[in-house]
């Protein structure tokens, strides 16, 4: 059975913590491939101002170029409009099944989603299509996270895996602020991502 991970996010910009999470998920879950999915318009973040999708896609592509087990998809960007997780997972389930009939999907995201999931559309369908894989983010109480995990699993008849990872203190917001303040970011992002940011004068 082929095992595929999908890691979604705005990736504005992608940074080394994203790559670490994807790599650890691949290793711990024995994934054959991890697909990065730059978000289109997210329903719960529809009013946020984000960088041009083509540039965000280019940054992800540049960041993963040396990882043969990573790929990037422009599905949500090309689709346009609001991006709903159940639609994205259904698209990939069908696409992957055309190539590998025997497959399993894992949707990788931050554990903060456990506290907003009841606002998502078609949650039961999401769990019918994929196993949810969450990683802890700063500010989340571990006991609260585990309680929410059990509650969501029971309510939606789903399966959730919690990845035990080191927390890297890197955030896209901090990187954007550092660029705006003319501070170095080469400790936090791959060199080619930094090149794209400065060439296109992003986050100024």
UniProtKB/Swiss-Prot annotation:
Its EC number is 2.7.7.18. InterPro entries: Cyt_trans-like (IPR004821), NadD/NMNAT (IPR005248), Rossmann-like_a/b/a_fold (IPR014729). One of its GO terms (biological process) is NAD biosynthetic process. SUPFAM superfamilies: Nucleotidylyl transferase. It catalyses: nicotinate beta-D-ribonucleotide + ATP + H(+) = deamido-NAD(+) + diphosphate. Pfam families: CTP_transf_like (PF01467). GO terms for molecular function: ATP binding; nicotinate-nucleotide adenylyltransferase activity. Keywords: ATP-binding, NAD, Nucleotide-binding, Nucleotidyltransferase, Pyridine nucleotide biosynthesis, Transferase. It comes from the Bacteria. It is an enzyme of class 2 (transferase). Pathway: Cofactor biosynthesis; NAD(+) biosynthesis; deamido-NAD(+) from nicotinate D-ribonucleotide: step 1/1. Catalyzes the reversible adenylation of nicotinate mononucleotide (NaMN) to nicotinic acid adenine dinucleotide (NaAD). Belongs to the NadD family. This is Probable nicotinate-nucleotide adenylyltransferase. It comes from Clostridium beijerinckii (strain ATCC 51743 / NCIMB 8052) (Clostridium acetobutylicum).
């Amino acid at each position: 059975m082929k095992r595929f991970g999908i890691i979604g996010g705005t990736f504005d910009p992608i940074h080394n913590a994203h790559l670490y999470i994807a790599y650890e998920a691949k290793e711990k879950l024995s994934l054959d491939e991890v697909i990065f999915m730059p978000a289109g318009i997210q329903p719960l973040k529809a009013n946020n101002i984000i960088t041009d999708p083509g540039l965000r896609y280019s940054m992800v592509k540049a960041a993963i170029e040396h990882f043969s087990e990573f790929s990037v998809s422009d599905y949500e960007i090309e689709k346009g409009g609001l991006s709903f997780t159940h639609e994205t997972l259904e698209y990939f389930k069908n696409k992957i099944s055309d190539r590998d009939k025997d497959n399993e999907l894992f949707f990788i995201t931050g554990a903060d989603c456990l506290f907003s999931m009841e606002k998502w559309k078609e949650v039961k369908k999401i769990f019918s299509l994929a196993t949810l894989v969450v990683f802890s983010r700063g500010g989340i109480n571990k006991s609260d996270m585990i309680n929410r995990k059990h509650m969501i699993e029971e309510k939606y008849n789903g399966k959730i895996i919690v990845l035990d990872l080191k927390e890297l203190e890197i955030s896209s917001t901090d990187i954007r602020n550092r660029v705006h303040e003319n501070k170095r970011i080469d400790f936090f992002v791959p060199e080619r991502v930094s090149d794209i940011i400065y060439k296109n004068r992003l986050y100024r």
